[in-house]
Amino acid sequence: RHHRKRIGHTVKQLAKLVKHIHEY
């Protein structure tokens, strides 16, 4: 089983959140 794709998706979402926080 490969859960790398799921982790990648989470990382991408986290990055988006971080960018949003940095914009504040």
Swiss-Prot record:
Tissue: Expressed by the skin glands.
An annotated GO cellular component: extracellular region
Cell compartment(s), UniProt: Secreted
Keyword terms, alphabetized: Secreted
Domain of life: Eukaryota
Record-given protein name: Skin secreted peptide 1
